[in-house]
Amino acid sequence: NTILYIFYKHDKLPNDLNRTIAGLVKDYIQQICASIMDERFDDILHQANPPFIYAEAYDDDNFMIAKSKGAWTVAALAKEGEIDSTLTTLVKETQRVKQYGFTPSEYERARINVLKQYESAYNERNNQKNDAYVREYVNHFTNGGYIPGIEMEYTLLNQIAQNIPVEQVNQYIQDMIGEDNIVIGLTGPDKEGIKYPSEENLLRTFLKARQMPVEPYKETVSNEPLVPTLPTPGQITETKTGQPFGATVFTLSNGIKVVLKPTEFKKDEIIMTAT
């Protein structure tokens, strides 16, 4: 797998501020920015012939192993022979955010998603595994920050989310995407037949893409119902209770078998899989 990275290095929030409400605000905005960028990358994946298989964005408080710098990072798993086009796409999407920011509706969706994650963590606070606490304490010891507990964090995040406008989010992300102090990384297998671009070619592609004109992000919103015409309802033709592990098996009129297994592992969660 060939993975392409662009690191936009930036100064970190000082530790004495990172352990205050300022650190929580910063983390909230970073999660919002990453969520919206990931949504935009997902839109590209649904277009014809995307150059990458997967792409994401995130802010790394530690650039690589450096403790003194953070980095707004965009990364993608490039398709074979599509390294240059992947780099071009990542740069153009980043420049789109740099120039125009995010839309209010994008922010609202991301805000709901982020708060939902914290709500889920809050609801599952009594089912938390030990390793989650260990990771949090280790991160606090090595990187600083805050560990107020999910009860306090959930309460504060709800207050913060109500008072952070999209303009503040846009100002943050546009400050993070600098014009210099940028690192391009490329990793892949040392395999016969695979050709990688030189450092000069990567730089040339990056600079060229950064000069390309980009338009504001345009959302395509459909008012059409998800299912325009509801199908004729089927029926449950057979119900088997007392199955292994407390499951119930329903046989439907179309021949599909549905296995229902209630658990108390998590609250407010339904998992569905099909084969």
Predicted regions and their residues:
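Proteolytic maturation boundary segments
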Residues: 1-42, 46-48, 108-112, 119, ...
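A structural supersecondary motif
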Residues: 7, 34-77, 136
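Acidic/histidine-enriched alpha-helical segments
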Residues: 52-56, 96-134, 157, 181-192
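Short, flexible segments with low predicted structural confidence
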Residues: 61-62, 132, 140-145
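M16/insulysin-pitrilysin zinc metalloprotease superfamily fold
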Residues: 64-123, 145-146, 159-163
